[in-house]
């Protein structure tokens, strides 16, 4: 429902598509870091993730500080960045020793992966059929956090029709034996204490 963005040439078709969508509200910012931090605040208040839409290279790098904050605080966030066209992108070409091939190219996914639950470079239009639902599910399931999709410019402008299935919330995974043991330990310690103090963290909120 909510998109925070700074427009840029590397994301021009994303800008057009999301910015003109009647069911999406786009808020245009002055800096990409502000986009990520606004998305974090939105998720805290609304209880659901917002989209951060970025351009390639420096635009994506600028957002990493806010994305890292969401990662450490378990806040869901969906980051969609533009990447240069595949023809001039190092990830699609064998050019040993080069650090940059295209204009304002950056190793976006390599930088985003350590601070995201899910980070993928979209290599073809059909990748989106799988990656979009996977990314959304990962963002909101289990311990929430940011996810990142990097989409080359020529894929952005493609007119190929794709079918994207609805994302599903992943089933929580519990080890009932460990949970029972932990509960018994907590009860034992509470019973033996005189003035117990309980510090509730984010996990309490996430558990519902």
PLM segments and residue spans:
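N-terminal alpha/beta PP-like core and its mobile active-site loop of ThDP/TPP-dependent enzymes
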Residues: 1-208
